[in-house]
Amino acid sequence: MTSALASRLLQDGLDMHRRGAVTDAAARYSQILKFEPKNVDALCLLGLAYGELKRSAEAVEFLRKATRLAPKHAVAHNFLGGALKELGRADEALASFDRAISHRPDLMDAYVNRADLLMALNRPAEAVETYDRALSIHPNFFQGWCNRGVALERMNRLEDAIASYDRAIALRADLTAAHANRGNALAALGRHEAAVDSFDRALATKPDFAEIHLNRGNSLARLRRREEALASYERALAIRPDMAEAQFGRGMVLREQTRFEEAVRCFDRAIALNRNDAVRGLFHSHRAEALNMLGRFPEALADVSHCLQVAPDDDQALYAVSLVELLHGRWREAWPRYERRIALKVGIPEGFSPPAWPPWRGESLKDELLVLRGEQGLGDHILFSCFGAHLAKLGYRIVLWTKPSLQPLLRTVPGVERVVSDIAVLAGSSDVRWASMMSVPGILGTTPETVPRNRPFLTAEPDRVAAWRERLGTHGFKIGIAWQNAGASHLDKLRSIPLREFATLGAIPGVRLISLQKGAGVEDIPAAAFQVETLGDNFDEGGGAFLDSAAVMMNLDLVVTPCNAIAHLAGALGRPTFVALMHVPEWRWLLDRDDSPWYPATRLFRQSGAGDWPGVFARIADAVHARRSQTD
């Protein structure tokens, strides 16, 4: 074969290759090699073609021959690395890419292939370094900037990843992957509004990308834009009906909307579609919560058992399981799993860092301080400060670490040495241990039968009590009431009571209803068809949270409230309290009992079915009549 003919056949093969006719191109290269078996260009191109045809072992054979004939042929080494990568021979592939780079330091493709392989090997730091070298050669390579962003995201360098995606987008405004990945990084930073914008830009270029609709739905759900989130999940499912994650996301939003039956059906579909045990365990755990809310307790507990079998170490799944177990009174089993909330940062403020002190695990202490960190809502700070009083009684030197607004109130917890809102004031203390307040019952092995009985454990200020006694007077049967929770979660919505339900109490002769409500809900008072006394604009406005509420409660005959901080405050003060509970309450109130292990003076009134506040208040009215007859 003449060199001219070989060149023409090679060019024919290249033209076919570029058009996508890879099999025909391979035939041309093979034809050349029959007559010129040492034609390095034909060997390289045949190896490349075989690689594209998934004939990787043959590709390696021809590319090795090329590199033996031309040891410094950088392109041949690069192609060989690609074929070896496809065969799973990663170390040999990296060595081939390195040889290509050593022979041609400006061969950008070799850097990119090397970096992509490092990403597949989960070595993102080395991948970033390699992408940087590629981009120093070709700074306008938009895909390189995008891939570099993925590597940075893998390293949790999210801001740097976003900057890299921005470079890619500046070079190629319609690069779908850059917009989508940018959205993922923003979502990981909690910047969900910006994430939705990035997902929208990605979908403008590729509207049928199911995963982007899924991630958009997740961010919208975090923003509580629930109807939009549902629409995104449904769009994802229209494109990919087998997408378990979209069914799961849809179920989570429906649960937030208190549409529990629909949520369970979504979780059912998600479980059926997913074969990954850990993920299925997570789905089972959330289905258990939804079943719980429907009162389908045997099914919920069956889901708990299944979850523990298939996902024995998944933080989200085990935390969800713990909430079901706690509600059912299985506290010993639940407490270790409840600790998973810490890894998930449940109720932990943004930017919180654990103290440097050693954690307390239940050991006896001599002169060391034991700092108990309050967590989650105001009611939980109040409730779990009872363990501060309990441990102080056992001889521990207790410091309560709480919200600034609660400091004055919690200073009345008996036996505690200090109440702080900033642990910097303890900087000079060397002998310190610490624990989260809501971890203490688990450390102590607390069960519903062994809750500390040191009630009351809060005290109202005597002067304030006297001032409110004079203001309120002594006439009538005084009932302090609260009705609406301030939060926006599905539980807050279910816990809140329409003010109109208190009409049955207001109709009882001699009863005075006195509002303990602050913030959301007070706007309902003027429209009430019965009298509700208010305590003025300055009520609980200065000097610390609940100081006036506590003093007023000491002058009341009864407090009636849903599950909220008012319920915990009244219980901690030892005041007679009726707590009106939704059909399936938070775990703190347990099931199937009308008393509380936390508060001996508290009675629980439960809905007989979802939304049955009239039934609850009929029973509360009967109890008020009975209570009045005892005191008359």
Show where each model-derived region lies:
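Alpha-helical solenoid repeat scaffolds of the TPR/TPR-like class and their adjacent stem/linker regions
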Residues: M1-D632
